[in-house]
A protein has these predicted regions:
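Alpha-helical segments flanking ligand/cofactor-binding loops in enzyme cores
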Residues: 25, 107, 130-131
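P-loop/Walker-type NTP enzyme "switch/lid" segment
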Residues: 39-111, 221-222
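Helical mechanochemical/support elements of P-loop NTPase systems and associated helical scaffolds
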Residues: 42, 56, 66, 70, ...
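Flexible glycine-/small-residue-rich
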Residues: 9, 38, 87-90, 121, ...
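Conserved catalytic-core segment of NTP-binding enzymes
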Residues: 111-112, 116, 122-208
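C-terminal lobe/tail of nucleotide-utilizing enzymes
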Residues: 167-271
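Walker A/P-loop NTP-binding active-site region of P-loop NTPases
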Residues: 4-69, 116
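Residue-level signature of catalytic and energy-coupling elements of molecular machines
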Residues: 12, 63, 86, 120, ...
């Protein structure tokens, strides 16, 4: 049975789609057959980050409305044989995203022997976000170390606890993981960002990883490559750690402290 993971946040621009792409890619690189679905009807960015925008013929709404089947709509990733992308529609109304339609798509993906289905949610509490989280078994709650982002993530946790299938049917709670993106320890030390402790005190869910602030994320997006593929970068290493922890490995948390300056830099103010 496929495990369904929603990547969600209350605020836009926190790195949800970047995370969905790297998380799904990381699972596939570990040998797991994985599908990643873009639920952001009308905007559609996942295909750009995955580098497959020119190969989109059919999308999620086409499948839901019976205009195409999954075999026609799924795009096989060029770098991972067991990774597939299902794009969102740029032209359809969000109301075309129905609960019964989403349920059938997820069921059919499970029947195709997918082990993991990653649902890339739009920000906030609109239809796409509700549909992305409704059938989830686990959730990656993505937040930046700033007050507004953390507050909005707290609202999302409330929705996960009340608006999902598991919550409505009184089943086991969705397993929630906190992922902090764009973290800069030096700015935390200067009081410009919330600390890990501050964020965890507010949200009170288990931390699965810290993604450092880095220009390599923008470079990866512009190249149409998931950041996890940016070999040698801190961001790539951080996402690999997240995947390892998700799959049960005990990995120390990295990228949480500012690098110590050497003696010469401290003496002469070098940068």
């Amino acid at each position: 049975m496929a495990r369904i993971i929603v990547v969600t946040s209350g605020k836009g621009g926190v790195g949800k789609t970047t995370t969905s792409a790297s998380f799904a890619t990381g699972l596939a690189l570990r040998g797991h057959k994985t599908a990643v679905i873009d639920f952001d009807v009308g905007l559609r960015n996942l295909d750009l980050i995955m580098g497959c925008e020119r190969r989109v013929v059919y999308d999620l709404i086409n499948v839901i409305q019976g205009e195409a089947n999954l075999n026609q709509a799924l795009i096989k990733d060029k770098q991972c044989d067991n990774l597939f992308v299902l794009a969102a529609s740029q032209t359809r109304d969000k109301d075309a995203l129905t609960q019964s339609g989403v349920e059938k798509v997820l069921h059919d993906l499970g029947a195709m022997d997918f082990e993991y289905i990653v649902c890339d949610s739009p920000a906030g509490i609109e239809t796409g976000a509700l549909m992305a989280m409704h059938f989830a078994d686990e959730a990656l709650v993505v937040t930046n170390p700033e007050v507004s982002s953390v507050r909005d993530s707290d609202r999302i946790l409330g929705m996960l606890a009340s608006k999902t299938k598991r919550a409505m049917e009184g089943g086991d709670a969705i397993k929630e993981h906190l992922l902090i993106t764009r973290y800069n320890p030096a700015r935390v030390d200067q009081g410009q960002m919330l600390s890990l402790e501050d964020i965890q005190d507010i949200l009170r869910i288990k931390l699965i990883g810290v993604i450092p602030e880095s220009e390599s994320v923008l470079q990866a997006s512009n190249q149409g490559v998931p950041a996890v593929h940016m070999q040698g970068s801190d961001v790539s290493e951080a996402y690999k750690d997240v995947i390892d922890r998700f799959l049960g490995a005990d990995k120390p948390m990295r990228f949480t402290e500012a690098p110590k300056q050497g003696l010469l830099k401290r003496l002469f103010g070098g940068k």
